[in-house]
Every structure is written in C-alpha cells, then in structure tokens.
C-alpha cells in the first residue's frame, strides 16, 4: 500500500476510535499555543478520555498514561491522558502513529517489532533545541551514540559518548545525529532497562521519518504531536503498548476491525 493511502487509512481509524467515545485530538483541549507549535494542555477545558482508558489496570495508580494501541501490523492510535484535580481522566492528545515493521511483540535485537507491556520514559533527548520539554532534555551531538555493543562494559542499550568508548561497535550502535528527521525529539522507553545483551535496544518514541510507514521497533508520531508530548510529559508517566483489541475489546468490536 502506498504511503499516502496508508496514512489516510490510519487517520480515519484514529478518528473512529476517538470520536464515538470522546473528543479526539488537541483542538478540543483548548491549548495554549507556543512558539514551538506545541501545546501546554489546560486540563480544565480538555475533553474526557474514552471510558476504556480509565478502566485499564495500569490507570489505577497512574496520574498520566501514554497509550500505543495497535490497529494494524505497523499502525497504531497513540494518545496521552492525565487525571485532573478531581481524578477524572482527560485526553491531552491523540494521533495516528507507526510501530515496528513486523508489528507488536518484541523479543530480541533486530526483530523489527515493538515491545508489548507497561513501561516508563526514562530520558528526553533530541537533535533539535529543547522544545520546552516538561522534563530534563538533552540535545545530542556528533559524539553521542546509543550503544548496541553487547560486550561487557559497553553499556548496551544506553546513550554513550564515543570519546569514552573509542572502540565502540558502531556498526551495531546508533549514531543519533544520523537520524536527522526521526530523532528531532525522542523519549526513551525503558524496554530492556537492565541492558540484557541481545534482548533489544534503542526503543524510542520519536518523530516520523519521511518515507517508511513503519519503524524498526520504536513508536513514531508526527513531529507536531511529538512536541505536544514533550511539553506535557511527566516523569511518572506510565506507557502502555498493546493492540487495541487487547486494550479495549469493545471498541475493537464496535469498529468491526
């Protein structure tokens, strides 16, 4: 399927998932515009989140939740929700997104799959200037790599400086500035936080690339939506990744997917 046709399909499905249940997207949240084209969401005017969001097990003890709900092999509807002062879930943003080329269910390095489970964001970084990120942000440079070096002591699945590890296995590591479109803004998802060699590395939330309607295992959003996430993310944000069919069977059935 051509990229444009696939994007149109994903947009339609994302709208269908949100609109019957609650307002979808940032327009309903009456956001305050910023010079970075992002939004700092005012929860007092934001739309209610879809009912199924608050019914998730992960939502019970969370104040903010980020959901990647797979709807196709490489597509997802991606949304962020936050409790207001009364404990009601409000939708900060919702957008189409891309997941791994081979879908959901990551188990090893290089399988081109996005992991399923409950995670957290551990690090905010990117090639671009700080977009007024709500948590600490690091602007990467030419010396920064994400280590895919499985040798002991080379910090597999961590950001490293090449000057500290001059013999780093760069072939299997990511030179972050080389991904000039995708890594404008990134949040690291703490999949394989223990750094078990071969289990997988460099699983990020990042901006969409220019051509491919999938990722190597990360989650990709339009750049403007990524800015919204960066400007509203909390340190304790809970990240949930699974299929929509698993997260909300009723919604899946209503959409006849």
Give residue spans per PLM region:
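Hydrophobic helical h-region of N-terminal Sec-dependent signal peptides
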Residues: 11-17
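N-terminal non-cleavable signal-anchor helices
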Residues: 11, 29, 40-42
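Short, solvent-exposed beta-strand edge segments and adjacent coil->beta transition regions
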Residues: 28-32, 63, 216
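Cell wall/extracellular polymer interaction/catalysis modules
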Residues: 38-215, 225-237, 241-257
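Sec-dependent signal peptide cleavage junction
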Residues: 17-38
């Amino acid at each position: 399927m051509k990229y444009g046709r696939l994007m149109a399909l994903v947009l339609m499905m994302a709208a269908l998932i949100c609109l019957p249940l609650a307002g979808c997207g940032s327009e309903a949240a009456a956001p305050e515009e910023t010079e970075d084209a992002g939004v700092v969401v005012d929860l007092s005017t934001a739309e209610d989140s879809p009912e199924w969001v608050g019914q998730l097990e992960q939502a019970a003890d969370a104040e903010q939740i980020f959901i990647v709900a797979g709807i196709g092999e490489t597509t997802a509807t991606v949304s962020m929700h936050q409790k207001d002062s009364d404990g009601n879930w409000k939708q900060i943003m919702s957008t189409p997104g891309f997941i791994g080329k081979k879908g959901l269910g990551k188990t090893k390095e290089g399988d081109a799959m996005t992991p399923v489970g409950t995670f957290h964001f551990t690090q905010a970084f990117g090639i671009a200037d700080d977009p007024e990120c709500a948590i600490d942000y690091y602007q990467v440079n030419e010396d920064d790599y994400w280590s895919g070096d499985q040798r002991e002591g080379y910090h597999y699945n961590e950001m490293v400086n090449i000057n500290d590890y001059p013999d780093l296995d760069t072939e299997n590591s990511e030179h972050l500035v080389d991904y000039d479109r995708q890594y404008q803004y990134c949040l690291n998802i703490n999949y394989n936080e223990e750094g078990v060699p071969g289990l997988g590395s460099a699983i990020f939330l990042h901006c969409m690339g220019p051509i491919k309607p999938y990722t190597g295992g990360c989650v990709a959003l339009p750049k403007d939506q990524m800015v919204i996430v960066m400007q509203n993310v909390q340190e304790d944000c809970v990240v949930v990744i699974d299929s929509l069919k698993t997260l909300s069977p009723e919604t899946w059935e209503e959409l006849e997917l």
